[in-house]
Amino acid sequence: MTDIEIYKSWPFRTRFLRPECWALIKDYIVKHEITSVLEFGSGISTILFNNLGVDVVSYETDPVYLRRIKSYNLANVEFRLWDNITASINGVFGLSLVDGAMPRMNQLSYAIKHSRYIAIDDFSDKESSEGLYPMVKDRTRLDDESIKMAIFRRFKQ
């Protein structure tokens, strides 16, 4: 299935990653040869990552929604339920996507520790003022009336 076909066939009435944001993330994945993704907020992006052949660890807060997404039988995805507090994350991922309505600063702290690049959907300046900018560099931000997406590269440690 193409990306457009996936968007057209999306059956859930939930907020999802907009095609313009996906295009930016997909370009980063291809350009930087990213092979693994840590995702906070399962959904259409999970399917799109899977179709790229990227290995995904995807956290979701809603157990009912998680069961529905799991029904897609995505070969490259490991699903986990997020308790809004802690996560058992090992290793370093090429990219983290922070999406959805979870407590984002907690997710961002995990993303910064475990990823080379951090993509934040519906990015706000409030998040940057809460301590994100000092921990990342090479900020690329696409921001207009319809898109609020930011991608950062963390400092090498």
Locate each region found by the language model.
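SAM cofactor-binding core of SAM-dependent methyltransferases
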Residues: P19-N84
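Short catalytic-loop micro-motif centered on adjacent basic/acidic residues
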Residues: S36-E39, V57-S58, L95-D99, A119-I120
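Short amphipathic alpha-helix with an adjacent loop that forms part of the alpha/beta core around
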Residues: I85-F93
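A polyampholytic, Gly/Pro-enriched intrinsically disordered region
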Residues: V77-L81, L97, T140
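Rossmann-like AdoMet
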Residues: M1-P11
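Conserved SAM-binding loop and adjacent beta-strand
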Residues: W10-C21
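C-terminal substrate-binding/active-site "lid" region of AdoMet-derived donor-dependent transferases
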Residues: G94-L95, A101-Q157
